[in-house]
A protein has these predicted regions:
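Conserved metal-binding segment of the jelly-roll/cupin
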Residues: 111-124
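Non-catalytic, conserved peripheral segments adjacent to functional cores
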Residues: 1-114
Length: 124
């Protein structure tokens, strides 16, 4: 199965309601500044798309979290993923019977070393 990122997102079948959103990286000699969430990003935030919680997680190098465990959310939930250091693979399976991508699986490779550095993976 092919990993999905910003470079190939238009050539693969994304699960319905999944959005990859590139973030603008502002770099200069003093460092890096990245806006991670703005209320005027209508694809990510807006009426009916408010967010209630934000957190970050650090995992030690060489460790895989939930390697043999899947998280299932039986209710409507939007998650926004952002990787600022390291690499992560996010697997998303569509079990919404009314969805045109029902029973589809997408694997998203996200890393700070990729061409676009940071992306939002927005899942409705």
């Amino acid at each position: 199965m092919e990993f999905i990122d910003l470079s190939n997102k238009d050539s693969v079948r994304l699960i319905k309601d999944v959005l990859l959103y590139p973030l603008k990286i502002n770099k200069d000699k003093s460092g890096v500044l990245v806006e991670t969430l703005r209320t005027d990003w209508r694809q990510i935030y807006g009426k009916g798309r408010e967010f209630a919680m934000q957190y970050y997680s650090i995992t030690a190098p060489g460790i895989a979290r939930d390697e043999n465990l899947w998280h299932y959310h039986p209710t409507v939930q939007e998650d926004r993923f952002l990787v600022v250091q390291g690499e992560v693979v996010v697997a998303i399976a569509d079990y919404r019977k009314e969805s045109p991508t029902y029973k589809s699986l997408n694997l998203f490779q996200m890393s700070n070393k990729m061409l676009y550095d940071h992306i939002y993976l927005n899942i409705a």
